[in-house]
Each structure stands twice: as C-alpha cells, then as structure tokens.
A protein has these predicted regions:
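Accessory, non-catalytic peripheral segments of nucleic-acid enzymes
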Residues: 267-414
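Divalent metal-coordination and catalytic microenvironments
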Residues: 8, 36, 51, 56, ...
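A conserved active-site cap/scaffold subdomain adjacent to cofactor or substrate pockets
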Residues: 215, 219-301
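N-terminal active-site segment of His-dependent metallophosphoesterases
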Residues: 1-74, 392, 400-402, 406-414
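Alpha-helical scaffolding segments of alpha/beta enzyme cores, especially the outer helices
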Residues: 38, 69-77, 102-105, 170, ...
Length: 414
C-alpha cells in the first residue's frame, strides 16, 4: 500500500511575489501550485493508493475562488485516477469559533468521490486499491470551540493548553486501542510535538501552541504517524515512523536552508503491526530558492557599492528571492548606491530587501577624522533613516538629540 504524505501547501501565501501578466495572479501562487503538481504527478505515475494532506491547504480560512479552483483541480486529478485523498483541517483551514465551515467542507458537501475530510478527532476507514486503511484524524483544535464545550475561560492560556493536551492524549489513546490490528493504521495530525524544531532551530517548547508528547502519538498500533503544521521536514521517531514532511515551498527567509518535499511510505497490509513498513523516502521538490547575501563594508573601502556587487557575483541569484544585508560604518552609508545593487540582481525573481545596518567605526578613524566626515546630528539622522523611523517619533528623537548635543557642546566649553 503506497501512501503519499504532504502538508502545509498553503495556497494563498504571496510574500515576495510579483504579478504574473498571463494569469493576473501572484507569481508565488504559481510557485505553490507547481510543487503541489509535483506531488500529484508523483502520486499518479506511481499509482499511489492514498494521499494524506495533513493540514493547511490554504493560507486563510476564506480562500479566494481562484485558490479554491486551483486546489480542487489537483484534488480532482488524484480522485479521478482512483487515488484516495484524505484532507485534514489545519489551523489555517479552520475558523476560531464553532459554526462556520472550514475551508475544506466544500468537498464532503459536494460528495466528491474518493475524497475524505478530517475535521474532528475520530477514526476513519478508507478503502484503497490495496485494501482498507484506518486513519485516526487529529485536526487542529480550535481553542474557542474547546473552551465553549468545557465552559472554561481563556484567562489562563497555560491551563487551557494543558487541558487540550490531556484530552487529546486520552482521545488518541482510546482511538488507537479501538483499532483493528488486522488492518493497517495511520495517524494524521496537524499539531505540535514537544521534540520538534522550527526552521529557525527553535524548540517548540518556546512557543504558545499546545504540545503533545511524542510518546502520546508514537503508539505501537500505528504503522505511520503523518503530521503537519511545522514547516521543517523532520523525523521524530522510527518505529512507528513519526514525520513532518514540512511545507512544499519556503514561506520566508527563516526557511532558506530547509529542504522541501513530501514523504512516501510503502506498507505491507499482510504483516502485523510494527512490521508493515516496506520502505520510506523523502522526495524533494523544486521549491523556489531563498538567498541571503551578506557584505561588510570597512571604513577604508573606496567603493562600497562595487564591493557589494562583487559579493553578489559570487552567488547564483537567478530566479531566487533575495535579501542583501550590508554592515556599514556611518561614514560609508551615503556611498552605497541601492539602485546599482538592485541592478546587479536583475536576474533574481524578487529582491525582498537591501538593508544597511550601521556598525561602529574603527578606532583609528575615530576622533577628528570621523568628525570631519559626519556630524553627530547627521549620524543620528542616518541611523533613524536606516531604522525606518519617520513622522512624529523621528521629530521627537531628533529634537532630543539636538538638545543632548547642545548640552554636551556647552559642557565642553565650560
């Protein structure tokens, strides 16, 4: 039984995109659809039995008609090729309050064949070409609905998280114990596990999500635990295998170094629990490249703009999303020509930022030499400009700076 596992598409994210003149949509929409197409094409060509979408099909709970059309077209391709599709509700798919539909409810409403949705914690029995598969669905828990059902307030977030964690753990255990051991079983969850890490190497223990212990989902009744929600691909356990496939595209520069793709697991339905895995692999997709270019300018540099352009030439910027981070002394700040720098990046897909960070001058340039190059008030103005401080706040800081400079000058003349 061939299972394809993906999550966190999420259609509608358009950061760092540009208008596509042909489709009249963001170029980033096409990025996400292209990698989703890779999942679909792999599944069809390899005759997958089922594709698990473990949450966050969309960026928002209210996807546009275009986003719904494009996602539905891919689901239809899978379903029409006799591939079962399981859609789990993630935090971006579900409303915060009870009542409104999730972004995925249209599929069961229309009765689309071979498509199954999981928006409650329960066990599903899905018939595939290779036989039945039990799926315990653990969608994202909406805290508002959870509080309403238990009659508790939100004045204690820690207590609320603990309540969710306890009840989820108990419910997963109960569903696992009720499984038929003669039929393969997987858990499909959109949640945070305590041992997982984000793309920035941050432990999930530092976040505000409710967290489940790995031991609460890595149960022997499951042949595979398919997760979503965290964008970094990672394997948390080997038996049963507990996996986040990660998002299909990089969302921001925090994911710059992440490898993007989806997971494929082949299980043998004739074996007993714990022995069914035949093979597992991670299939990399052609995700849009993110690239950070760093350059440090010295106070002796005669041509800082050329120094930065030379550094850019050391990188392959073609069709990448770029950010340029420049450390520069105040004396060289005005010598950096951002227009020329952006011109050197014309082969890139998008230039997110060219950011100049002020650094201290070298000791041998301090004193009279630096005072001749830039006055204290000018340095303050440059600093505020670089930090994007404008309006009334800028005026207040400049006035305060003038006062301090004046007081300092007067004290030196006494």
């Amino acid at each position: 039984m061939l299972i394809v596992h993906t999550a966190d598409v999420p259609i509608g994210v358009e950061n760092y995109g540009r208008p596509d003149p042909l489709t009249k949509t963001s170029s980033r929409l096409q990025d996400f659809l292209n990698t989703l197409d890779e999942v679909v094409e792999y599944s069809v060509s390899n005759q997958a039995d089922i594709v698990l979408f473990c949450g966050d099909a969309y960026k928002s709970r209210n996807p546009s008609q275009t986003h719904q059309r494009e996602f539905a077209a891919r689901i239809s391709t899978l379903a029409s090729n006799d591939i079962q599709v399981f859609l789990l509700a993630g935090n971006h798919d579900a409303p915060n309050i009870p009542g409104p539909a999730t972004a995925l409810d249209i599929f069961p409403t229309l009765g689309v064949g071979n498509v199954h949705t999981g928006d409650t914690l329960k066990t599903h029995l899905v018939e595939t070409r290779s036989g039945p598969l039990q799926i315990v669905s653990v969608p994202w828990i909406r805290k508002g609905q959870f509080m309403s059902s238990l009659g508790i307030g939100d004045n204690n977030p820690s207590q609320l998280n603990e309540s969710i964690e306890t009840l989820l753990t108990q419910a997963i255990q109960a569903n696992a114990e009720a499984l038929d051991p003669s039929i393969p079983a997987v858990l499909s969850g959109h949640l945070s596990v305590d041992s997982a890490k984000t793309s920035s190497e941050t432990s999930m223990m530092l976040g505000k999500d409710y967290l489940l212990l790995k031991s609460s989902i890595a149960l022997p009744q499951f042949d595979y635990v398919a997760l979503g929600h965290i964008h970094r691909h990672q394997e948390l356990n080997l038996s049963p295998r507990v996996v986040y496939p990660g998002s299909l595209q990089r969302i921001d520069f925090g994911e710059e170094k992440d490898t993007k793709g989806f997971c494929v697991i082949d299980i043998d339905p004739t074996e007993s629990p714990g022995k069914r895995e035949r093979s597992y692999k991670f299939v990399e997709v052609n995700a849009r490249k993110f690239l950070t270019i760093k350059s440090t300018i010295s106070d002796e540099d005669p041509n800082p703009t050329q120094t930065i352009i030379t550094e850019i030439a050391n990188h392959n910027v073609q069709e990448a999303i770029i950010q340029v981070l420049i450390d520069t002394p105040a004396s060289k700040y005005q010598d950096i020509d951002e227009k020329l720098i952006r011109g050197a990046l014309e082969e890139s897909h998008f230039v997110a930022t060219v950011r100049k960070n002020l650094i201290s001058e070298s000791r041998n340039r301090l004193g009279k030499d630096i005072s001749e190059k830039i006055e204290p008030l000018e340095a303050l103005e440059t600093y505020l400009t670089e930090r994007g401080v404008t309006g009334k706040k800028r005026e207040q800081l400049l006035n305060k700076g003038k006062l301090l400079i004046s007081e300092h000058s007067q004290s030196n003349t006494l």
